[in-house]
Swiss-Prot record:
InterPro entries: SDr-like (IPR050972), Trypano_PARP (IPR008882). This is Procyclic form-specific polypeptide B-alpha. It comes from Trypanosoma brucei brucei. Pfam families: Trypan_PARP. Residues 124-145 form a propeptide. The gene is PARPB. Transmembrane segments: none annotated.
Amino acid sequence: MAPRSLYLLAVLLFSANLFAGVGFAAAAEGPEDKGLTKGGKGKGEKGTKVGADDTNGTDPDPEPEPEPEPEPEPEPEPEPEPEPEPEPEPEPEPEPEPEPEPEPEPEPEPEPEPEPEPEPEPGAATLKSVALPFAIAAAALVAAF
């Protein structure tokens, strides 16, 4: 039978690995993904997202005010021209109706290629980064017992 100190050491290693793995995964996600907000204490108000470059409530790049559009100058009214008398046009002979052309059959659309999976962001929590501490801790517990 193993001494009690080995059991305590195994539990300690399990806890340390577990908390380290969860901490690394949370740090990789960043504060904006956790829904942390600044302000918005009143009822019905929404705060602003906390970013890495928080400027303590000041807007570093205020939007420029749009310049007023200049008013267009009034155009002088043209003088009306006298209307010429219309000449009688000869009646055109009716043309025979052309036969309607058969519509070409629409070509079937090619199937779209499946989109490739997006590459993970650098530093993002992956299955490997989260599962590895659990595996190490479980192996330590099994080895202790």
